[in-house]
């Protein structure tokens, strides 16, 4: 089987046997056939595979290599350290964004005075950039809500009970 790959997408003539027959009687004008070629995405350049078994072995070795690469740089000790830093940081920013949501209800608050500046100063540089992308809707600033959602999502995905860093930190070292 000959496979031609171009920038991570391979066009394989051998895959044409798995394709359904076209209901149209007129041929496809691009390749003069009655059916379209099947495109399969791959992560490697495969010169020639004599059998499908070789192709399956190559694909399995690629997926195993990608799995090993993604977990190679992060050992359980580093994951525990990252949890210790990211967990409180994400919780603190989540709380600050909740305060900013409440502060957005009162636009005349003196944000440069003591109690309000604690929530205003760390979050405003992030919110200014986000306001350029998401303008206020009907006079209501929605950017603190967007950032609270993003911070909550990251917290759950990374350091939640089934988070990625928690799972890596519980991994047994061989």
From Swiss-Prot:
Residues 40-78, 169-174 are lumenal. GO terms for biological process: cytochrome b6f complex assembly. It comes from the Eukaryota. Residues 1-39 form a transit peptide. Keywords: Chloroplast, Membrane, Plastid, Thylakoid, Transit peptide, Transmembrane, Transmembrane helix. One of its GO terms (cellular component) is chloroplast thylakoid membrane. InterPro entries: CCB3/YggT. The chain crosses the membrane at residues 79-99, 148-168. It is found in: Plastid, Chloroplast thylakoid membrane. It is a multi-pass membrane protein. Its main location: plastid. Residues 100-147 are stromal. Belongs to the YggT family. Required for the biogenesis and accumulation of native cytochrome b6 in the thylakoid membrane. Controls the conversion of apocytochrome b6 to holocytochrome b6. Required for covalent binding of the c-type heme to cytochrome b6. This is Protein COFACTOR ASSEMBLY OF COMPLEX C SUBUNIT B CCB3, chloroplastic. It comes from Arabidopsis thaliana. The lineage of its organism: Eukaryota, Viridiplantae, Streptophyta, Embryophyta, Tracheophyta.
């Amino acid at each position: 089987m000959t496979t031609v790959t171009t920038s991570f997408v391979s066009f394989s003539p051998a895959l044409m046997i798995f394709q359904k027959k076209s209901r149209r009687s007129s041929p496809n004008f691009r390749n003069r056939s009655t059916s379209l070629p099947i495109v399969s995405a791959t992560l490697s350049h495969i010169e020639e595979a004599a059998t499908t078994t070789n192709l399956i072995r190559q694909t399995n070795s690629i997926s195993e290599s990608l799995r090993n690469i993604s977990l190679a740089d992060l050992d359980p000790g580093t994951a525990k350290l990252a949890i210790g830093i990211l967990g409180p940081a994400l919780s603190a920013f989540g709380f600050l964004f909740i305060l900013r949501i409440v502060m957005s209800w009162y636009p005349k608050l003196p944000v440069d005075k003591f109690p309000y500046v604690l929530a205003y100063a760390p979050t405003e540089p992030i919110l200014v950039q986000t306001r350029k992308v998401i303008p206020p809707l009907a006079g209501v600033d929605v950017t603190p809500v967007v950032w609270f959602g993003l911070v909550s999502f990251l917290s759950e995905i990374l350091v939640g009970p089934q988070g990625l860093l928690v799972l890596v930190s519980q991994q047994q070292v061989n």
